[in-house]
């Protein structure tokens, strides 16, 4: 399972002109399930994402996670957006192949599991809409962007 995370000062996702999720300072996580992923990969990825230290401490070092982004126990927002294109195979030709991505029904199940677990573990979780054409706007803080991946069990 893959997450492209971006530290943001604000982010919003809309579908058909309707805002489905919006956060202030925190993380925007574009999330993708790969073939062979299970709930175990989703949970490992979420644990890594929530504890990944990308916010600055008092000395200006990236040393704080989204769950304690100000160093005083205050959590930042988490906006989770499904994006199957993260699994694209771009190794040959000029058109991406999405064969590595999970089938839509598996992707939805794993995305829903990821979001459910995120809401249980983090106080401020917003989402996009799985499978919808979305418009995502953000102000990247830094910019700070990281690629996190927990490989499918068969490829681990």
From Swiss-Prot:
Matches recorded under SUPFAM superfamilies: DTD-like
Main localization, broad class: cytoplasm
Pfam families associated with the record: Tyr_Deacylase
Keywords: Cytoplasm, Hydrolase, RNA-binding, tRNA-binding
GO cellular component terms listed in the entry, alphabetical order: cytoplasm
InterPro entries, per the entry: Daa-tRNA_deacyls_DTD, DTD-like_sf
Any one GO MF annotation of this record: D-tyrosyl-tRNA(Tyr) deacylase activity
Domain of life: Bacteria
Catalysis: reaction(s): glycyl-tRNA(Ala) + H2O = tRNA(Ala) + glycine + H(+); a D-aminoacyl-tRNA + H2O = a tRNA + a D-alpha-amino acid + H(+)
A biological process term (GO) from this entry: D-amino acid catabolic process
EC number per UniProt: 3.1.1.96
Subcellular location, record wording: Cytoplasm
Chain location of the short sequence motif Gly-cisPro motif, important for rejection of L-amino acids per the record: 142-143
Written domain comment of the UniProt record: A Gly-cisPro motif from one monomer fits into the active site of the other monomer to allow specific chiral rejection of L-amino acids.
Subunit record text: Homodimer.
Function field: An aminoacyl-tRNA editing enzyme that deacylates mischarged D-aminoacyl-tRNAs. Also deacylates mischarged glycyl-tRNA(Ala), protecting cells against glycine mischarging by AlaRS. Acts via tRNA-based rather than protein-based catalysis; rejects L-amino acids rather than detecting D-amino acids in the active site. By recycling D-aminoacyl-tRNA to D-amino acids and free tRNA molecules, this enzyme counteracts the toxicity associated with the formation of D-aminoacyl-tRNA entities in vivo and helps enforce protein L-homochirality.
Family the UniProt entry places it in: Belongs to the DTD family.
HAMAP family: Deacylase_Dtd
Name under which the protein is recorded: D-aminoacyl-tRNA deacylase
Organism: Cupriavidus metallidurans (strain ATCC 43123 / DSM 2839 / NBRC 102507 / CH34) (Ralstonia metallidurans)
Gene for this chain: dtd
């Amino acid at each position: 399972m893959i997450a492209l995370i971006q530290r943001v000062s604000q982010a919003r996702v809309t579908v058909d002109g309707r805002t489905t999720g919006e956060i202030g300072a925190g993380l925007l996580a574009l999330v993708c399930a790969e073939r062979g992923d299970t709930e175990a990969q989703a949970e490992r990825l979420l644990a890594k994402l929530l504890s990944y230290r990308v916010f600055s401490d008092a000395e200006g070092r990236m040393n704080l996670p989204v769950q304690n982004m100000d160093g005083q126990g205050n959590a930042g927002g988490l906006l989770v957006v499904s994006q199957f294109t993260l699994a694209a195979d771009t190794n040959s030709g000029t058109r991406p192949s999405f064969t590595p991505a999970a089938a839509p029904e598996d992707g939805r199940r794993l995305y829903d599991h990821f979001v459910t677990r995120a809401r249980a573990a983090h106080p401020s979780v917003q989402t996009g809409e799985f499978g919808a054409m979305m418009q995502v706007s953000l102000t990247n803080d830094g910019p700070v962007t990281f690629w996190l991946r927990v490989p499918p069990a068969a490829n681990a």
